[in-house]
């Protein structure tokens, strides 16, 4: 039989990670923008951290910069940004900020079929360099196809200004690749889902690299930020190879999104994924204790009470997490987990 398999992969072309690299934005824009108009999606705080300097650099070139100050990553705000920028003959879109601003920018770039530059101001999760955008509607998070960044500019001198909690959450998000890949392998074995061994290996390597460097990460200097960020980038690249988010999103992310749907809003994405990773590894009958110890060493709690969560909220999130993305098969199965099984898993792992 003639071999007919093919796949298109998109990767970042210009990646700058390190001290004082914001000024490289002009090089990346010059090489990739189709016009002299640039759209920047940012927030009030992140504008002061990095956006203002980027505007000054580009405006002196000169580029016409169109700023869009965005709120949460939801479909309402996406529509608002689209309406604000409809008449702009933009040649490139830049996202400056944390996960929400970057998700909105990458989705906007995808919808407009424009190149996208990711400029994170904190290393809080692995969406910095992935082709997926997480947007919410009615409290539910949906994973949408977004533009893979043509450029990533991660300035450690900017990112170090974020609280350590954000760095720890980003590290936890990368570590959660362990359970995501286990779910992917399970879906491949039981459902015949397409599997990429190279994407899985890159994803797992990123997680193990972070685990092996917890002591360095805890120092919380620019080197710590660089270490976590480079593995976040590798995780995003794994998703680009796979053509989907499987290398970095499994049952632990479904659980995280179920918590969000239940109204939990005082946890960072990586913290929710850490909690989900522990219960996922327990269900996989893997060494969840080891990973729980790693999270504790990072300073990431997986105990519901430390976030003020009611036990019933966590129990119901676990029971119904599978329904967040019913097409994504994981260790959670295809129907609601029994109440007793959910309680047992959460109690034995120390989550409740």
UniProtKB/Swiss-Prot annotation:
GO MF annotation list: glycerol-1-phosphate dehydrogenase (NAD+) activity; glycerol-1-phosphate dehydrogenase (NADP+) activity; metal ion binding
Co-factor remark: Binds 1 zinc ion per subunit.
Protein name: Glycerol-1-phosphate dehydrogenase [NAD(P)+]
Pathway assigned in UniProt: Membrane lipid metabolism; glycerophospholipid metabolism
Keywords associated with the record: Cytoplasm, Lipid biosynthesis, Lipid metabolism, Metal-binding, NAD, NADP, Oxidoreductase, Phospholipid biosynthesis, Phospholipid metabolism, Zinc
SUPFAM superfamilies for this protein: Dehydroquinate synthase-like
Record carries keyword Oxidoreductase: yes
Amino acids binding substrate: 126, 173, 257
Positions contributing to Zn(2+) binding: 173, 253, 269
Catalytic activity: sn-glycerol 1-phosphate + NAD(+) = dihydroxyacetone phosphate + NADH + H(+); sn-glycerol 1-phosphate + NADP(+) = dihydroxyacetone phosphate + NADPH + H(+)
Chief localisation class: cytoplasm
EC number: 1.1.1.261
PANTHER family: GLYCEROL DEHYDROGENASE, GLYCEROL DEHYDROGENASE 1
Gene3D superfamilies documented for this protein: 3.40.50.1970, Dehydroquinate synthase-like - alpha domain
Family per similarity comment: Belongs to the glycerol-1-phosphate dehydrogenase family.
GO biological process: glycerophospholipid metabolic process; phospholipid biosynthetic process
Species per Swiss-Prot/TrEMBL record: Thermoplasma volcanium (strain ATCC 51530 / DSM 4299 / JCM 9571 / NBRC 15438 / GSS1)
Protein localization: Cytoplasm
GO cellular component: cytoplasm
Cofactor: Zn(2+)
């Amino acid at each position: 039989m003639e071999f007919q398999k093919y796949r298109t992969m998109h990767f970042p072309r210009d990646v700058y990670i390190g001290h004082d690299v914001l000024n490289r934005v002009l090089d990346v824009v010059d090489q990739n923008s189709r016009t002299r108009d640039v759209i920047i999606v940012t927030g009030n705080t992140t504008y002061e951290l990095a956006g203002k300097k980027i505007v000054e650099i580009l405006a002196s070139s000169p580029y016409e910069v169109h700023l869009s100050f965005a709120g949460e990553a939801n479909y309402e705000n996406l529509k608002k940004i689209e309406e604000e920028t409809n008449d702009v003959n933009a040649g490139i879109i830049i996202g400056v900020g944390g996960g929400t601003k970057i998700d909105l920018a990458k989705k906007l770039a995808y919808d407009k079929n424009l190149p996208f530059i990711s400029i994170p101001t904190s290393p809080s999760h692995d969406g910095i360099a992935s082709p997926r955008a997480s947007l919410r509607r009615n409290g539910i998070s949906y994973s949408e196809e977004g533009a893979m960044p043509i450029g990533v500019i991660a300035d450690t001198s900017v990112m170090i200004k974020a609280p350590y909690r954000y760095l720890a959450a980003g590290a936890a998000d990368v570590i959660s690749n362990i359970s995501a890949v286990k779910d992917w392998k399970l879906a491949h074995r039981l459902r015949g889902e397409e599997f990429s061994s190279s994407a899985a290996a890159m994803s797992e390597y990123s997680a193990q690299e972070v685990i092996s460097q917890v002591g360095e990460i805890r120092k919380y200097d620019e080197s710590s930020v660089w270490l976590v960020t480079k593995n976040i980038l590798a995780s995003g690249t794994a998703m680009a190879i796979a053509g989907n988010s499987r290398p970095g999103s499994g049952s632990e992310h479904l659980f995280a999104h179920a918590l969000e749907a239940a109204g939990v809003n005082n946890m960072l994405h990586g913290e929710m994924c850490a909690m989900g990773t522990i219960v996922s590894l327990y269900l996989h009958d893997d060494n969840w204790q080891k990973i729980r110890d790693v999270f504790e060493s990072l300073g990431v709690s997986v105990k519901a009470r430390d976030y003020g969560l009611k036990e019933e909220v966590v129990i119901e999130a676990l029971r119904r997490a599978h329904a967040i993305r019913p097409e994504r098969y994981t260790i959670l199965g295809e129907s609601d987990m029994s109440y007793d099984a959910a309680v047992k898993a959460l109690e034995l792992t120390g989550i409740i």
